Swiss-Prot record:
This is DNA-directed RNA polymerase subunit beta. It comes from Leuconostoc mesenteroides subsp. mesenteroides (strain ATCC 8293 / DSM 20343 / BCRC 11652 / CCM 1803 / JCM 6124 / NCDO 523 / NBRC 100496 / NCIMB 8023 / NCTC 12954 / NRRL B-1118 / 37Y). The keyword Ligase does not apply. One of its GO terms (biological process) is DNA-templated transcription. GO terms for cellular component: DNA-directed RNA polymerase complex. The RNAP catalytic core consists of 2 alpha, 1 beta, 1 beta' and 1 omega subunit. When a sigma factor is associated with the core the holoenzyme is formed, which can initiate transcription. The keyword Transferase applies. DNA-dependent RNA polymerase catalyzes the transcription of DNA into RNA using the four ribonucleoside triphosphates as substrates. NCBIfam families: PRK00405.1 (NF001616), rpoB (TIGR02013). SUPFAM superfamilies: beta and beta-prime subunits of DNA dependent RNA-polymerase. Its EC number is 2.7.7.6. Belongs to the RNA polymerase beta chain family. Keywords: DNA-directed RNA polymerase, Nucleotidyltransferase, Transcription, Transferase.
Length: 1202
């Protein structure tokens, strides 16, 4: 036997073909959600109140400070919140302290700050009773970015952007003449030197003193920057110029300009780099990284001892940098302090760190490297030192020193997870509240006011509510199956507020970048307009405190060159400095490399390199891909496009009645199911005392009893059936974190999205043409692919102007047969079988004494009775919604339920449908091999194997070669061997079974080595000419079921303006006969067909009613009238002032129907209802029917005369 046995959980053992030793377990897969929210509760709230408070009033007498906060007990628990359509949230109480500086009085008070949504253990929120997920957002990181463009003459232009987390952008750029300009917040250009002068370095000599005179761009800019107004100092003139750019047309003074610049860049409330922005700027401008590979133009010595560290002319390599690093970190090494003039924006001195280097393009020329000194990590605004050092980097870039940034590099894109997104929203609410507090401080009496009276929590509550309810990133959770659920929580979206938009995103942003390796899955992304903008976190990826994605690597010892088990998590820009060997590099037992050279990655290059240069090694072959992709066996043999479809379609698999985990898995099935949140996990170890379908009781080792309530037939967000089944038995000892009960799409603790049928690749009567699938009837009969779907329907009884609506069994014009399953209140009983159009909740609405509609006139004409003054507004089963009533919930204010204003009672009915697989359903394997069922063949007619076993599914062999997803064929063969041997196997991605191993498994199972078999025709018993590939493959039924899509319209709603039928299943619409279809009929000269399609069947309002009448009366169909859309066109032209008339063949004007003539035409639905409510009418002879109609016509005539 090749391979080794691995236990997954307690109940499943697989033969694993993995050859690479895993040194690191897959981390908790939904930690991205839970850890981020935990950070928000622990630190995020404090940080935010710290930013906003203390709030001082305008006079400075009152000051409101934040002390502490606490979350109270939630009002509803998770299940109650679901049931009551409420939020799972806890009241937030904040302790505030109000200080009166005049009297010295201090008041502390606990202020209620609204209900705050809590995250469930599964990483979701329950908002209005529905589970929602906050998707993490991928955005540009704050920091300083350099770019280069080439103009049409081939000259390079450089640009710099300083991007804060919030606040004004600062941009430097060179123009066509090579002069350096600055833009503040996307306004008009300003010379770069003017900004330096505004910072307090007024004279040309000051500027040259800082930057040196070796830069052409700077010298040209200084030439252009002349002193215009001699009455102002250079600093004041520069300040006024800046002000004019920012506020054009306003009177400019140096003071207002100073205040404006301070507010724009140096006020922490207006400008915030966030800790990540400060980190990125310090990293970009620090001399440690910038000195690498440059040649020194001065000798560097120890400031204390005078000992020489590096001689002039030394090329700075990694070794020299490691010697220099401790000195560069010192406050007194090569630093110069400049003091700005007294009339500058900021008066504090500026400390810069400067080192001279040779220009790479001209060694005679000496350039300066200016670092931003030692700015504290906690300083969240941009400092003058940043601005000057940033300008120096910009000038050096034009001399060939430094490098431009790649905006799509994951070192420059960061993740905003739940915690941060929530914090940003909360901060917006607090900022709005701050304004209110300031106003109230100045209005109210300072001696009597309390914190409670100052605070208005409305803006805060509104901001949080809006975020959870309607933000683009707060999404209704995909609950088709556990994999879809987990994938949704690990999704990374570049869309949303502060992100990209679909139309503006180019190809570069969407493309796979080399830094995605181990961080973002290159495969799993939607097809369509969002491709590449929505991604999935890789299996081992995690997010660090700055929001950058890190991936783990095994450290390689630099002296022994052996791979250790020490794990380092690296961000994308750290990884750029190292050479990383691939996970499949062969190792000896002691961790040394087998070969002297290995394939490795360095930056974006794949290189073959000697082992003494290797710094790190991949942790696992599956670290490249996400969990969904890692569940595809033989992924390495599939084309990437098909792998993408396979990964996406696994999320759409419907939970089946009795699912089976794949015979050929990848070994991640257990972890995926365990972390998805649908399995029941043991909280502590102990012994099982009691098990049934509803609960499991476990006696802990310390004697406590844990009770686990199982989820039973709950409707998921996607209308699927979520159900849990115990997999432990009484007396069994269990460990903490073990799976006690399977959720939907699980078996024995593993993910089980489909079944393992016997599949053959062969054609059958052309029925599997173009990806169609031929099924064995056994799959229908034995409920192999049967799923349960639950739909919910609501009916509300409201107060109307004419009186309250009433839930009742007394419904006008309904027979007893329709009421047989309703109780006294008109509510359906649980367990009743209902069909389309059946009443679920009987409800009547009072009718005002209005003029009779044509419908009622018709009823009067036939029955001559006064109709009751109520209308039937019962809740009925919609088309395709029939099934068994599974549950009924009644909500009334008397029971303490919170209902919307004006609602007296609400009834919610759940209908369960059992759907067997049928023609038209979509099915798929895990390799993007999808198809629709075209025919279900009796078992005895299906082709069968030599031992008499009929094949379950026939797939077309044409679907394999052109699509290059060969993984399905390998899975088929290995699955056949596994089935015969009665084992489960694991073939992990990029480390799975080889061809030889599959052949050995087939031989072990006593099967032919090529995996093919003779197959006999079930109808004739003859063998087919050629041997056929037969085997076992994991095959799923997808959520695209024909029941949800099939649709037919007889009579339905019409659009108000054009009077044409609406479109779409949801509106019970018709089929659009478009322009091209009209051409087709015209081409065949089918004039009458075309005419009726354009008139009676569409928008000839009078005509379609007359057709209905003539059909009922059995008369010939009258000639069509003028279509409504034509009338609309005429009216539009008349509205434009064109005199438009319609003439007939004789030249007489055709009268078009007037707007107010609608009443005189009987609505078709009135007639339909008449026929429905009085079926006996249709059985009477024509004369009686005709009489009824003529009576109606008379009535409408008299009505018109009135």
């Amino acid at each position: 036997m090749v391979g080794h046995l691995v236990k997954y959980g307690k109940h499943r053992t697989r033969r694993s073909y993995a050859s690479i030793k895993e040194v690191l377990d897959v981390p908790n897969l939904i930690e991205i959600q839970t850890a981020s929210y935990q950070w928000f509760l622990n630190d995020g709230i404090k940080e935010m109140f710290g930013d906003i408070m203390p709030i001082d009033d305008f006079q400075g007498t009152l000051s409101l400070e934040y002390v502490d906060y606490q979350l109270m007990e939630p009002k509803y628990n998770i299940d109650e919140a679901r049931e009551h359509d409420a939020n799972y949230s806890a009241p937030l109480h904040v302790t505030l302290r109000l200080t009166n500086h005049e009297t010295g009085e201090i008041k502390s008070q606990d202020v209620f700050f609204g209900d705050f949504p809590l995250m469930t253990e599964q990483g979701t929120f329950i908002i209005n009773g529905a589970e929602r997920v906050i998707v993490s957002q991928l955005v540009r990181s704050p920091g300083i970015y350099y770019n280069q463009t080439t103009d049409k003459n081939g000259r390079p232009h450089f640009g710099t952007t300083v991007i804060p987390n919030r606040g004004a952008w600062l941009e430097y750029e060179t123009d066509a003449k090579g002069i350096a300009n600055v833009r503040i917040d996307r306004t008009r250009k300003l010379l770069m030197t003017e900004l330096v002068r505004a910072l307090g370095f007024g004279s040309d000599s000051d500027i040259i003193d800082i930057f040196s005179d070796q830069y052409d761009a700077l010298n040209m800019t200084l030439e252009k920057d002349v002193h215009k107004d001699m009455s102002d100092s250079r600093v004041e003139e520069a300040l006024k110029d800046v002000y004019e750019r920012l506020r054009p047309g306003e009177p400019k003074t140096a003071d207002s300009s100073r205040a404006l610049l301070v507010a724009r860049f140096f006020d922490p409330k207006r400008y915030d780099l966030a800790s990540v922005g400060r980190y990125k700027i310090n990293k970009k401008l620090s001399l440690k990284t910038r000195l690498l590979n440059q040649t020194l133009a001065e000798t560097l010595a120890d400031p204390d001892s005078g000992e020489i560290i590096a001689e002039k002319g030394t090329l700075v390599d990694k070794e020299v940098i490691s010697k220099l690093t401790p000195y560069l970190d010192r406050e007194d090494f090569k630093t110069t302090t400049y003091t700005p003039s007294g009339d500058a924006v900021l008066e504090e001195p500026v400390t810069l760190q400067k080192i001279k280097i040779e220009s790479p393009e001209n060694p005679e020329k000496t350039l300066l490297l200016i670092g931003n000194g030692h700015i504290d990590e906690d300083d969240r605004t941009v400092r003058p030192a940043d601005i000057l050092a940033g300008m120096n980097y910009f000038l050096n870039l034009q001399e060939g020193v430094g490098h431009v940034d790649d905006i799509d590099h994951l070192g420059n894109r960061r993740i905003r997870s739940v915690g941060e997104l929530l914090q940003n929203q909360f901060r917006i609410g607090l900022t709005r509240m701050e304004r209110v507090v300031r106003e109230r401080m100045s209005i109210q009496d300072a001696n009597t006011v309390t914190p409670q009276q100052l605070i208005n929590i409305r803006p805060v509550v509104a901001a949080v509510k809006e975020f959870f309810g309607s933000s683009q990133l707060s999404q209704f959770m995909d609950q088709t199956n556990p994999l879809g659920e987990m994938n949704h929580k690990r999704r990374l979206s570049a869309l949303g507020p502060g992100g990209l938009t679909r139309d503006r995103a180019g190809v570069e942003v969407r493309d796979v970048h080399y830094t995605h390796y181990g961080r973002i899955d290159p495969i799993e992304t939607p097809e369509g307009p969002n491709i590449g903008l929505i991604n999935s976190l890789a299996t081992y990826g995690r997010i660090n405190k700055y929001g950058f994605v890190e991936t783990p690597y095994r450290r390689v010892d630099w002296t022994t060159h052996k791979v250790t088990d020490k794990i380092d998590y690296l961000t994308a820009d750290e990884e750029d400095n190292y050479i990383v060997a691939q996970a499949n590099s062969p190792l000896n037992e002691d961790g040394s490399f087998v070969h002297n050279t290995v394939m490795a990655r360095f930056g974006e290059e794949n290189i073959e390199t000697p082992i003494d240069r290797i710094d790190y090694m991949d942790v696992s072959p599956k670290q490249v891909v996400s969990v969904g992709t890692a569940a595809i066996p033989f992924l390495e043999n599939d084309d990437s496009n098909r792998a993408l479809m396979g990964a996406n379609m696994q999320r759409q698999a419907v939970p089946l009645l009795d699912p089976h985990s794949p015979l050929v898995g990848t070994g991640i099935e257990y972890k995926a199911a365990h972390d998805s949140g649908v399995a029941m996990i043991a909280r502590a170890s102990g012994e099982v005392e009691y098990v049934d379908g509803r609960q499991i009781r476990v006696r802990r080792e310390d004697g406590q009893l844990d009770t686990y309530e199982l989820m039973k037939f709950r409707r998921s967000n996607g209308g699927k059936n979520y159900n849990q089944k115990p997999i432990v038995h009484v007396g069994e000892h269990i460990e903490a974190d073990e799976v006690l009960a399977d959720g939907p799409s699980m078996e024995q603790g593993e993910l089980a999205l489909g079944q393992n049928p016997l599949i053959a690749f062969m054609t059958w009567q052309g029925y599997n043409f173009e990806d169609a699938i031929v099924l064995n009837e056994r799959l229908v009969r034995e409920d192999v692919y049967t799923s349960i779907h639950i739909e919910e329907y609501d009916s509300e009884a409201r107060d109307t102007k004419l009186g309250p609506e009433e839930m009742t069994r007394e419904i006008p014009n309904t027979g007893e047969d329709q009421l047989k399953d309703l109780d006294a209140d008109g509510i359906i009983r649980v367990g009743a079988e209902v069909h389309d159009g059946d009443i679920l909740v009987g409800k009547v609405t009072p009718k005002g004494v209005t003029e009779l509609s044509a419908e009622e006139r018709l009823l009067h004409a036939i029955f001559g009775e006064k109709a009751r003054e109520v209308r039937d507004t019962s809740l009925r089963v919609p088309h395709g919604g029939g099934g068994v009533v599974q549950n009924v919930r009644i909500y009334t204010p008397e029971n303490g339920d919170e209902l919307a204003p004006g609602v007296n009672m609400m009834v919610r009915v759940y209908i369960a449908q059992k759907r067997k697989i049928q023609v038209g359903d979509k099915m798929a394997g895990r390799h993007g091999n999808k198809g629709t069922v075209s025919v279900v063949v009796p078992e005895e007619d299906m082709p069968y194997m030599p031992d008499g076993t009929p094949i379950d599914i026939l797939l077309s062999p044409m679907g394999v070669p052109s699509r290059m997803n060969i993984g399905q064929v390998l899975e088929l063969h290995l699955g056949f061997a596994a089935k015969k041997l009665g084992i489960h196997v694991a073939s992990p991605v990029f480390d799975g079974a080889s061809d030889d191993e599959i052949e050995m498994a087939l031989r072990e199972a006593g099967l032919p080595q090529d995996g093919k078999s003779v197959v006999y025709d079930g109808r004739t018993g003859e063998a087919f000419d050629k041997r056929v590939g037969v085997g076992v493959m994991h095959y799923m039924k997808l959520a695209h079921m024909v029941d949800d899509k099939i649709h037919a319209r007889s009579i339905g709603p019409y659009s108000l303006v054009t009077q044409q039928p609406l479109g779409g299943k949801a509106q019970f619409g018709g089929q659009r006969f478009g322009e091209m279809e009209v051409w087709a009929l015209e081409a065949y000269g089918a004039a009458y067909t075309l005419q009726e399609i354009l008139t009676y069947k569409s928008d000839d309002v009078a005509g379609r009613v007359k057709v209905y009448e003539s059909i009922i009366k059995g008369e010939p169909i009258p000639r069509p009238g003028v279509p409504e859309s034509f009338r609309v066109l005429v009216k539009e032209l008349q509205a434009l002032g064109l005199d438009m008339q319609v003439l007939d063949g004789a030249g007489d004007e055709v009268e078009l129907r007037q707007m107010d003539e609608d009443d005189s035409i009987l609505p078709v639905d009135a007639l339909e209802k008449l026929a429905r409510t009085n079926p006996d009418l249709l059985n009477k002879d024509d004369e009686e029917v005709a009489a009824a109609f003529s009576k109606v016509e008379e009535q409408s005539q008299t009505f018109e005369e009135k």
